Design a protein with these regions (language model features):
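Interdomain/boundary linker segments immediately adjacent to catalytic/signaling cores
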Residues: 1-22
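Catalytic core segments in nucleotide and nucleic-acid processing enzymes
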Residues: 15-168
Length: 168
């Protein structure tokens, strides 16, 4: 499959909708690890639940709890509510075509003012730009770095290597 995102062209071997959110989760983890190299950003399999692993979200950075999902529902909104009640700031990252759904769910549940909801594509693209500027790299080199980290995370935590991404 060939897709174009705001960071460049890539090939993803997994079919759209078949990853169960694992692609999205590992891409955010790779982005966070690349953005914060001094931190150890945990790498859990995509099926590992937050409660079972004692996490407040898929990723925790200081007082921020990141939740990553391919299909937002009331369950992730409830997790965001619990984060806010515990004085953590929830950030919900979803595919761009799910952004409005996530925002409507947050509004319906009355927490839209206490959660940041971002499109995955924008989240990654903004960080590609910021990291590139900070380190004096071109955007493609930074994207290569993030995808390299993503593929490392897939190899470490998943059994389905079809989830790996190849930059073209």
């Amino acid at each position: 499959m060939r897709e174009t995102n705001s960071g460049g062209c890539y090939q993803r071997r997994a079919r759209r909708g078949k990853s169960g959110g694992r692609i999205e989760q590992h891409l955010v983890g790779a982005k966070l690890q690349t953005r914060h190299p001094e931190r150890d950003v945990p790498n859990h399999p995509g099926h590992a639940g937050d409660l079972q692993t004692g996490r407040t979200g898929d990723f925790e950075v200081d007082s921020i709890s990141y939740h990553v999902t391919a299909t937002p529902g009331r369950d992730v909104i409830e997790k965001c509510r619990a984060n806010a009640a515990a004085n953590r700031h929830p950030v919900l990252v979803v595919p761009g075509d799910q952004l409005l759904k996530a925002k409507h769910l947050a509004e319906d549940e009355g927490i839209s003012d206490r959660v940041t909801i971002l499109a995955l594509e924008d989240f990654v693209a903004q960080n590609v730009i910021e990291i590139s500027v900070e380190h004096g790299n071109d955007f493609y080199a930074t994207l290569q770095q993030i995808i390299g980290e993503y593929n490392r995370r897939i190899e470490e935590a998943e059994t389905d290597m079809a989830l790996k991404i190849e930059l073209l």
